């Protein structure tokens, strides 16, 4: 059992199941990936297989190992706003949330850029920002420091402290 506000790190060799665990918690297994599940996965007291994906997405934010696999837009601002756009927020609230997110994460220099022109580390930052903008209770980060240089890893550490301070589960 992982409690609210807890910070958990899964370590292990390649292929041991770390990504599989994240896919179970964010509902991709069994809804998108086939597999045989023995046991139950509960999020917020509910069995994950019984929760619609849109409800899971409101509670669980995922940053994938390869950030390109989660992008839906070409420019960074649209990508950061994408998840909250699906919540039908008014345009001015979207703009405010994108601004607040980029300020909180100190990534203003990445605003209004073409995603395909970003470095791997910058793409990782935008992927994290798109999840942060949605303000989920649970963050699932699959190899979040991949593609990051040492300075960016330090920045990620500060971002994780920020969400931990907000009482989020990581």
Language-model region placement:
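Catalytic Walker B motif of ABC-type/P-loop ATPase nucleotide-binding domains
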Residues: 139-142
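Conserved ABC transporter NBD signature motif
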Residues: 34-46
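Conserved catalytic motifs of ABC-family nucleotide-binding domains
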Residues: 135
């Amino acid at each position: 059992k992982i409690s609210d506000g807890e910070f958990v790190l899964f370590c292990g060799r390649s292929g041991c199941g770390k990504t599989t665990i994240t896919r179970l918690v964010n509902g991709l297994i069994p809804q998108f990936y086939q597999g045989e599940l023995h046991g139950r996965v509960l999020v917020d007291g509910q069995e994950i297989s019984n929760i619609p994906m849109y409800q899971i997405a409101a509670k669980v934010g995922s940053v994938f190992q390869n950030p390109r696999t989660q992008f839906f837009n070409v420019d960074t601002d649209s990508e950061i706003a994408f998840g909250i756009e699906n919540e039908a927020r008014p345009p001015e609230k979207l703009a405010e949330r994108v601004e607040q997110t980029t300020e909180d994460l100190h990534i203003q220099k990445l605003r209004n850029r073409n995603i395909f022109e970003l470095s791997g580390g910058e793409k990782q930052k935008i992927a994290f920002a798109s999840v942060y903008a949605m303000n989920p209770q649970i963050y699932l980060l699959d190899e979040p420091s991949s593609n990051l240089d040492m300075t960016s890893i330090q920045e990620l550490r500060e971002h994780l402290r920020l969400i931990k301070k907000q009482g989020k589960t990581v």
